[in-house]
Design a protein with these regions (language model features):
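Intrinsically disordered, low-complexity and often Lys/Arg-enriched segments
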Residues: 1-3
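A secondary-structure boundary/capping signal
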Residues: 7-9, 39-40, 109, 121
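Residues at secondary-structure transition points
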Residues: 21, 38, 61, 85-92, ...
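Membrane interface segments of multi-pass transport proteins and intramembrane proteases
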Residues: 56-57
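Short, well-structured alpha-helical segments
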Residues: 60-71
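Active-site neighborhoods of divalent-metal-dependent phosphate/nucleic-acid chemistry enzymes
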Residues: 71-108
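Acidic, PIN/NYN-like endoribonuclease modules and their adjacent C-terminal/linker elements
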Residues: 92, 103-104, 110-131
Length: 131
């Protein structure tokens, strides 16, 4: 049974910008279906917005392919909106999705989130699940 998680945008962005490193390993595991990701319309919209920013110089084609993979392989959920204090409100969608799905939140910005056992770095996630 595949491991399940929510991926913060920084993990997706890092995977798209570099084919090496823990974020790339995680995205490869999503593509080969050994990891399932939970997504929502808000999360997919955030991914697309960030990947499309001009200064990252990611082609529209690559953004489209990435979003298509995420939509095709992701588990679409509708999550509750919490009132948990957040350092950055734009991170709430990922926190709330992980809480609602009762799964891991994988992020390179652990410090942006409340201290919770389900929040983990890409390196920690890869070590814990032998990715």
């Amino acid at each position: 049974m595949p491991t399940k998680c929510v991926l913060d945008t920084n993990v997706i962005l890092s995977a798209v910008l570099s084919y090496s490193g823990y974020p790339a390993k995680i995205f490869d595991a999503v593509a080969d279906k050994s990891i399932k990701i939970y997504i929502s319309e808000e999360i997919v919209s955030e991914y697309k917005d960030v990947l499309s920013r001009e200064y990252f110089k990611i082609s529209k084609d690559k953004v489209g392919r990435t979003i298509n993979i995420i939509r095709k392989l992701g588990i679409m959920i509708v999550h509750e909106i919490s009132d948990f204090p957040m350092k950055d409100e734009s991170d709430r969608i990922f926190f709330d999705a992980a809480q609602s799905a009762e799964t891991w939140l994988v992020t390179g910005n652990v410090k942006h989130y409340p201290k919770k056992d389900f929040i983990i770095t890409p390196a920690g996630f890869c070590r814990n699940f032998n990715i």
